[in-house]
UniProtKB/Swiss-Prot annotation:
Matches recorded under SUPFAM superfamilies: Aldolase
Catalytic activity: aceneuramate = aldehydo-N-acetyl-D-mannosamine + pyruvate
Any GO MF annotation of the entry: N-acetylneuraminate lyase activity
Record-listed E.C. numbers: 4.1.3.3
Descriptive protein name: N-acetylneuraminate lyase 1
Entry superkingdom: Bacteria
Any one cellular-component term (Gene Ontology): cytosol
């Protein structure tokens, strides 16, 4: 059901203007930029997209704009997860209406829901998605929900689930999931261990830094398919040098600043309470943007 979703999927950023409103023109440019750099698909409205500081209406607008720009060109996954099941269902129905290829949802967070309540939450969203495969989103560091291997097994075998976004540094668990579920589409979620995640069994990845250097991650996939571990490791090291800088600056605002210097995003701001990049990092981010543009050609 979801085998066509394998690949390198950029976790799409959401541009805002100086007044903190959606910057629709920059969003359209960013979608086209990702298409042009050879990304297999987009993961829209997730953590990188600052979904949880947007209204439901804004999240629907983002889905609609992305579909207008990219439907039929690359694969589109709509992250529809909310704490509220009803709101998640509303977004899932919108994703279906706009022509997305799949939906995804983070485990419901903040309140200490039981595991059965998690399962009911996913079943309801899957029902509202009306045939679109579900990508379960496991990100314990941000959700606070630490799923056991048995719980992951249960979630990924729910009717309608076709994939798992595994944003965890536990490569042993990644391998265990692959061993138990050989046909499951499995995404690596942490960019800094992309190559290792592929070796542990991931089919591809969903990541934020793909927005500025997606071709490097495609290069890692190609190298590993050819058995060239040395090249894959070299590319991963180059990616991680960038990630080192972004961690210092704040990843999302750092990425937006690089894209601003690439003339893709007009305003390099995240939505409050996120603040701007510290000015002391701007020269490094500008140099990085120039380096990546030259490398991309």
């Amino acid at each position: 059901m979801a085998t066509n979703l394998r690949g390198v999927m950029a976790a799409l950023l959401t541009p805002f203007d100086q007044q903190q409103a959606l910057d629709k023109a920059s969003l359209r440019r960013l979608v086209q930029f990702n298409i042009q750099q050879g990304i297999d698909g987009l993961y829209v409205g997730g953590s990188t997209g600052e979904a949880f500081v947007q209204s439901l209406s804004e999240r629907e607008q983002v889905l609609e704009i992305v579909a207008e720009e990219a439907k039929g060109k690359i694969k589109l996954i709509a992250h529809v997860g909310c704490v509220s099941t009803a709101e998640s269902q509303q977004l899932a129905a919108s994703a279906k209406r706009y022509g997305f290829d799949a939906v995804s949802a983070v485990t419901p967070f903040y309140y200490p829901f039981s595991f059965e309540e998690h399962c009911d939450h996913y079943r309801a969203i899957i029902d509202s998605a009306d045939g679109l495969p579900m990508v379960v989103y496991n990100i314990p560091a941000l959700s606070g929900v630490k799923l056991t291997l048995d719980q992951i097994d249960t979630l990924v075998t729910l009717p309608g689930v076709g994939a798992l976004k595994q944003t965890s540094g536990d490569l042993y668990q990644m391998e265990q999931i692959r061993r138990e579920h050989p046909d499951l589409v499995l995404y690596n979620g942490y960019d800094e261990i992309f190559a290792s995640g592929l070796l542990a069994g991931a089919d591809g990845g969903i990541g934020s830094t793909y927005n500025i250097m997606g071709w490097r991650y495609q290069g890692i996939v190609k190298a590993l398919k050819e058995g060239d571990i040395q090249t894959a490791q070299k590319l991963q090291t180059e990616c991680n040098k960038v990630i080192d800088l972004l961690i210092k600056t704040g990843v999302f605002r750092g990425l937006k600043t690089v894209l601003h210097y690439m003339d893709v995003v007009s305003v390099p701001l995240c939505r409050k309470p996120f603040g701007p990049v510290d000015e002391k990092y701007l020269p490094e981010l500008k140099a990085l943007a120039q380096q990546l543009m030259q490398e991309r050609g």
